[in-house]
Amino acid sequence: DAFSSLRAHLETAYWEEAVALLTEEDLAHLRALVAAASEKLSQPRIQIPFQEHRELHLTIFRRLDNPFVVGILGAYWDAYEAVELNTFADLGYLQAVWRYHERIVAAICAGEYAEGKRLLIEHMQLLSARGAPMELPAGANGAVPALRV
């Protein structure tokens, strides 16, 4: 999907700049979002942590001084909800997504931005594997393979 590809390219292209701008308050908020999502997924009546998912990604990029990037990412999450990608897939998928989020946030908090970016790209592949194809940026060589599952 072209919109998902745009999101993947934006998030990876602006990753280093965005995470370098995060404040201690932002880092605490990211950790709280991971904890809230984990709580929702461990309840007897599981709740889908869509708002936490959206907020986690938008928090990482919200300090960018670029209203176009922030606006496009916000529109992506609106579309994500509109086409019901926020609906229940299966518990294993949701748990895998949030394990990635936890590791991404831990890497950011530790200042390991390259590791966080690597995990972000792996995390995006989960969506592709779920049946929502997207093109993901490859490594530093700039090649962008189309991932279709």
Residue ranges and their predicted role:
Residues 125-134:
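Short arginine-rich
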Residues 89-93:
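Solvent-exposed loop and edge beta-strand segments that line ligand/cofactor-binding
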Residues 1-12, 16, 20, 133-149:
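Short linear motifs at protein or domain termini
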Residues 112:
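Phosphate-/nucleic-acid-contacting segments
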Residues 3-86, 96-106, 115-126:
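Conserved amphipathic alpha-helical segments that form helical-bundle/coiled-coil interaction surfaces
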